[in-house]
Structure formats: structure tokens, C-alpha cells
């Protein structure tokens, strides 16, 4: 089951992006030392050695993760909205089970594309440093398409949950199709509106 959360970032945009893309959290050793040597021998002319040693799970949607901060700021300045909320930071965490970093990142990218990809710049990373693999999202608070701000509310959270549940089902991961999280009628009303 995937769990999601989203919160606003009002300062230090660069630090949030750096945290999400932290190499110590997003790198996976994919080869043994023996395999490294074989790769070095075979691919020494074609590949940079550092790039064959590990894989990083850091991608961008409508932006380059390496320059995302500058790209986010450029969009804000272009629309005169460089104050207030700078970005949103969120995560999608997976139940401890057999999920590979590759699949977590794939689901994370699909999730971000569906929820924000048509209008917003998003940095998507998968952190591998805990028992529960989890994707981090840093979303520009201003749309590059129309300059409108991203607003997070409880209704949006239900949409996130529905998208996450559908993707978990699609990839054969556990999800709870009928969570009884609250007995309040407003909870169900907001769910229906999502």
C-alpha cells in the first residue's frame, strides 16, 4: 500500500531539492566488484566509469533535476509570483515488500505525471535508505503553462490516494480498496468530489 503526504515549502527551495536528490539516499549499487571490473574491461572506451558503478533514482518532469531550482525560480519570476509558497514537497511510500527501486521510481514517475505533469515542474526521486522505499516529489508552486499556483487541499489528497491505489493495483502491489479511515460524512463527501 502506498502512503502519500504533501506539504508546502516557503523558503530554501534549493535545500528541499538537494534533500530529495541526495545521492546517499538515491544511489543503488547494481554490480558486484567482479562485475564492475568486467564492465570496466569491456566498456572502458564507451562509458564513464563512475556512471557504471551505481544508478541514481532522480528524474525531472518538465525540468532538469540538476538545474530545477533555477528553472522553478525562472517560472515564478516570469509570472511575478516569486513570493509565498515556493514549492510543495511530498512523498509516496511503499509497504515493505518485494518492490525494486526501479519499480518504485517507475510508479513515482507515473504518479507525478498523472497528478502534476501537464502543468507543473516536478523533481521525482526514490530514496533507498530505509526499509520502505519511498519517492519524494518537489513540485514548483507555479505552473509553467499558465502561471497559476498549485493549491493543496484535502480533496487533492483523495485524488492522490486514488491514483496511488490504482498504480499499486496495476503493478500487483498491496493496496486497501476500502480504507475505513474516518466515519465522518465530510470525509466521504470529499472522497466523492476528488
Predicted regions and their residues:
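N-terminal nicking endonuclease/strand-transfer module with a His-rich metal-binding environment
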Residues: 1-194
Amino acid at each position: 500500500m502506498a502512503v502519500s503526504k504533501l506539504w508546502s515549502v516557503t523558503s530554501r527551495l534549493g535545500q528541499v531539492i538537494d534533500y530529495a536528490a541526495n545521492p546517499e539516499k538515491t544511489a543503488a549499487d547494481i554490480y558486484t566488484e567482479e562485475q564492475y571490473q568486467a564492465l570496466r574491461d569491456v566498456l572502458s572506451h564507451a562509458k564513464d566509469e563512475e556512471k557504471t558503478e551505481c544508478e541514481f533514482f532522480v528524474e525531472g518532469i518538465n525540468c532538469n533535476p540538476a538545474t530545477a531550482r533555477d528553472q522553478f525560480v525562472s517560472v515564478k519570476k516570469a509570472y511575478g509570483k516569486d513570493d509565498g509558497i515556493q514549492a510543495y514537497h511530498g512523498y509516496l511510500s511503499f509497504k515493505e515488500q518485494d518492490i525494486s527501486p526501479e519499480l518504485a521510481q517507475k510508479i513515482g514517475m507515473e504518479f507525478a505525471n498523472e497528478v502534476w505533469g501537464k502543468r507543473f515542474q516536478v523533481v521525482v526521486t526514490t530514496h533507498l535508505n530505509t526499509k520502505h522505499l519511498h519517492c519524494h516529489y518537489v513540485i514548483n508552486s507555479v505552473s509553467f503553462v499558465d502561471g497559476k499556483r498549485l493549491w493543496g487541499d484535502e480533496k487533492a489528497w483523495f485524488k492522490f490516494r486514488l491514483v496511488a491505489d490504482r498504480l499499486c493495483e496495476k503493478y500487483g502491489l498491496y493496496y486497501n480498496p476500502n480504507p475505513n479511515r474516518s466515519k465522518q460524512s465530510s470525509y466521504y463527501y470529499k472522497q466523492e468530489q476528488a
